[in-house]
Amino acid sequence: MRSEGDTWDITTSVGSTALFVATARALEAQKPDPLAVDPYAEIFCRAVGGTAADVLDGKDPDHQLKTTDFGENFVNFQGARTRYFDNYFARTADAGVRQVVVLAAGLDSRAYRLDWPAATTIFELDQPQVLDFKREVLARAGAQPRAERREIAIDLREDWPQALRDSGFDPAKPSAWIAEGLLIYLPASAQEQLFTGIDGLAGHGSHVAVEDGAPMKPEDFETAVAEERAATAQGDQRVFFQLVYNEQCAPATEWFGNRGWTAVGTPLADYLREVGRPVPGPETEAGPMIARNTLVSAVRA
């Protein structure tokens, strides 16, 4: 379970979920018709080694990401999510935004793989050990960012708005924000603080994109946590429900809409259909998760 002030690297606690998601992106890139191609996802997996690399080589057929009930649907989910936010950044760049803020950047490689206009600055915020891992791995691979990239090593439960300003962020200029795969790891109070921080720093013409998820029924969540703990006691290394908070301060469309933003939410299931990927049914392991997920983008006039 989580604790106040807990920290992590890329192979422990919340950090390990970034590696799991990167593995899914790498598997998506292996498809003949990928929704998105992140060449650095595989580099991260091979830097860690073990099952993260084995599954890419077909050496771990029992890996969770290879199951039909969960894995195939989760890989589709990550491919679709990546495309959605990639397209979001293309739109914000076309709109003239030159400040980008990646909250809980994890193994996000958009600074390296997307085409950014000249004079774009990308601020990446995350735990120090996570940023260190990404920088070192990409440096060994000879990768160079395609925009000015500034790391801000900070926990989002701390005063990250001040740290962002100290790193050269200008609230008077338009900015584009992303909170991808983040909110579930924050209690409702911290989500509220995060949204408030964005709202306080985003000037006119700014954009924000959020992956939003409705909470599970409390009894279902408690059952999932109990089952996962029992599996952990039997040696299962997979942990998810013990890392998340089954809370929501408010739907992102509602929160930002009530503060003068024009917000549009796209249910993940609808977006999967739009990009030609199947939507898993409620009887599958991945189905309920996908049904609760909404991709949100908002703009401040």
UniProtKB/Swiss-Prot annotation:
Protein known as: Putative S-adenosyl-L-methionine-dependent methyltransferase MAP_3777
Role this protein plays: Exhibits S-adenosyl-L-methionine-dependent methyltransferase activity.
Amino-acid positions noted as binding S-adenosyl-L-methionine in the UniProt annotation, renumbered to this chain: 126, 155-156
Coiled coil residues, start to end: none
One of the GO biological process terms: methylation
Keyword S-adenosyl-L-methionine recorded: yes
Taxon lineage: Bacteria, Bacillati, Actinomycetota, Actinomycetes, Mycobacteriales
Homology family: Belongs to the UPF0677 family.
The EC number(s) this enzyme carries: 2.1.1.-
